[in-house]
Structure formats: C-alpha cells, structure tokens
Amino acid sequence: MATPVKVVEILSAEDLRRTLTRLASQIVERTRDLSQLVLLGIYTRGVPLAELLARQIETLEGINVGVGALDITFYRDDLDQIGLRTPAKTSITLDLTGKTVVLVDDVIFKGRTIRAALNAVNEYGRPEVIRLAVLVDRGHREVPIHPDFVGKQLPTAKEEVVKVYLQDWDGRDAVELVGY
C-alpha cells in the first residue's frame, strides 16, 4: 500500500469508550430478553469489540451475554480481489436457534463482509433475529445491508481507509482516517 498522505484521528480513546457505552446501551434497549443475546464478533477487530460490548452490557445490566468469534473467510464472494488468508478459528459454542444475534464489526464499507457473515451464521442454528453493530459506517455499500447500531457515521472517499486500533490488540485505542 502507498505511503499515507494524511492521517486524521476520528475517535480518541475517550471517544471510543463513550461510543462503546452508547452502542451497548442501544443494544440493551432493543433486546427483549438479554439472556438470549449473543454477540458475534467478525474477525479481526469485531472480536475484541464484541468482548468490549459484552463487558459494557454486564456493567450496565449485571448480566453476562454470550460472545463468539466468527471467521467468514470461506463465505466471501470477493476472495479473488482480497486474496485468501489463513482462516481464524470460529468460536461459537452454543446453538444460535431462537437467539438474538448481534454481529459486531469494526467498519462497514461495501457490506460484503456482513453478507458473508449472514451466510456463516446459518451453520450454527436459526436465530430469532440477527442485528448488526458497527463502530464506523463509512458508506459506499455494494449490497443492501444497513447496520442497526452505529457508533460513528463517517463519509469517506473510496480510496481512504478507516483504521481501528484497540488496546488489547494494538496497544492503544483510536480510530483514524487515512488518506492516500
């Protein structure tokens, strides 16, 4: 990839904390029965985001919700464009039938990752409802997918990149917009 021309901080560590608190509150408000809630993080950054949201929901409501990790590598329709990577391990230890599943991802762009995730989820049961939570929605959809919970709407140019940094993975919390 080319050298970045411009890097702009979109969310600081404190902004990110507040955004996750708001997302967790919105998920709680829209979920009838929290005991049936499962957060499925999509590799890579969606996994720690799902864990952070689960902790925040526990803080808010005093209930542990189910958390899993979903690798959608073999469900993608654009492998020829993005290339095949070594798959991560999907970790879903419960039947999703009848559950309220919230797919969690860091950034939604074209929508293809979420389309693949919807296909993958069906292998683990038939949820009552599937919702989508994203930290950043940057637009430019190529498929008709719309998130239910959005931390930050961020109009971008197609060639720009949104980078999400999380303490447990990257040593810092921030969201940056990178222009090339």
Swiss-Prot record:
Q: Which UniProt keywords apply?
A: Glycosyltransferase, Transcription, Transcription regulation, Transferase
- Put simply, this protein is called Bifunctional protein PyrR
Q: Give any GO molecular function from the UniProt entry.
A: uracil phosphoribosyltransferase activity
Q: Which cysteines are joined by disulfide bonds?
A: none
Under the heading HAMAP family, the entry gives:
PyrR
Motif PRPP-binding mapped to chain: 101-113
Q: Write down the chemical reaction(s) this protein catalyses.
A: UMP + diphosphate = 5-phospho-alpha-D-ribose 1-diphosphate + uracil
- The superkingdom listed in its UniProt entry is Bacteria
Function, as annotated, reads: Regulates the transcription of the pyrimidine nucleotide (pyr) operon in response to exogenous pyrimidines.
Please verify whether the record's keywords include Signal. Answer: no
Sorted alphabetically, which Pfam families does this protein's record hold? Pribosyltran (PF00156)
Which protein family is it in?
A: Belongs to the purine/pyrimidine phosphoribosyltransferase family. PyrR subfamily.
Give the CDD domains listed for this entry. PRTases_typeI
Against SUPFAM superfamilies, the record matches this protein to: PRTase-like
The species this protein was found in = Trichormus variabilis (strain ATCC 29413 / PCC 7937)
> What's an example Gene Ontology biological process for this entry?
regulation of DNA-templated transcription
Q: Which EC numbers characterise this protein's activity in its record?
A: 2.4.2.9
The keyword Nuclease appears for this protein: no
